[in-house]
UniProtKB/Swiss-Prot annotation:
SUPFAM superfamilies: Ribosomal protein S5 domain 2-like
InterPro entries per the UniProt record, alphabetical: Ribosomal_Su5_D2-typ_SF, Ribosomal_uS9, Ribosomal_uS9_bac/plastid, Ribosomal_uS9_CS, Ribsml_uS5_D2-typ_fold_subgr
Gene Ontology terms for molecular function: RNA binding; structural constituent of ribosome
One BP term from GO: translation
Protein name in the entry: Small ribosomal subunit protein uS9
NCBIfam families reported for this sequence: PRK00132.1 (NF001099)
HAMAP family recorded: Ribosomal_uS9_B
Lineage of origin: Bacteria, Pseudomonadati, Pseudomonadota, Gammaproteobacteria, Aeromonadales
Encoding gene, per UniProt annotation: rpsI
GO cellular component: cytosolic small ribosomal subunit
Highest rank taxon of the organism: Bacteria
Annotated family: Belongs to the universal ribosomal protein uS9 family.
Keywords noted in UniProt: Ribonucleoprotein, Ribosomal protein
């Protein structure tokens, strides 16, 4: 790997993102598509850009991202986590800022399993007193 390339792996729910960052003009390519093409939902685009906007790196790094698994929200969260790790590899002094915003910690919440005798993970059948 080149010296001027920075890498970060991000995970969220069942999604995994691999983020490669290089000093550049601010291009973001996700699975060989642009950010706008890949995420049509504006909230997902906002989540992806949060870490970059926080440390004012929006137009300074080119990002090449591969993401697999999960849905839109999980993939957006995984990309944000991966970007955060790549930024910390690029400049370790950004860590406290990113930590304070909560981007460094992996979101460990997962889907709770459905239990036998229940409709969903916690939804119970209607109770009849008589």
């Amino acid at each position: 790997m080149a010296d001027n390339q920075y890498y970060g792996t991000g995970r969220r729910k069942s999604a995994t993102a691999r983020v490669f960052a290089k000093v550049g003009s601010g291009d973001i390519v996700i699975n060989k598509r642009s950010l706008q093409d890949y995420f049509s939902r504006p909230t997902a685009r906002m989540v992806v850009m949060q870490a970059l906007e926080l440390v004012d790196m929006t137009g300074k790094l080119d990002l090449y991202i591969t993401v697999a698994g999960g849905g839109i929200t999980g993939q957006a969260g995984a990309i944000r986590h991966g970007i955060t790790r790549a930024l910390m590899q690029y400049d370790e002094s950004l860590r406290p800022t990113l930590r304070k915003a909560g981007f460094v910690t992996r979101d460990a919440r997962r889907v709770e399993r459905k239990k036998v005798g229940l409709h969903k993970a916690r939804k119970r059948p209607q109770y009849s007193k008589r």
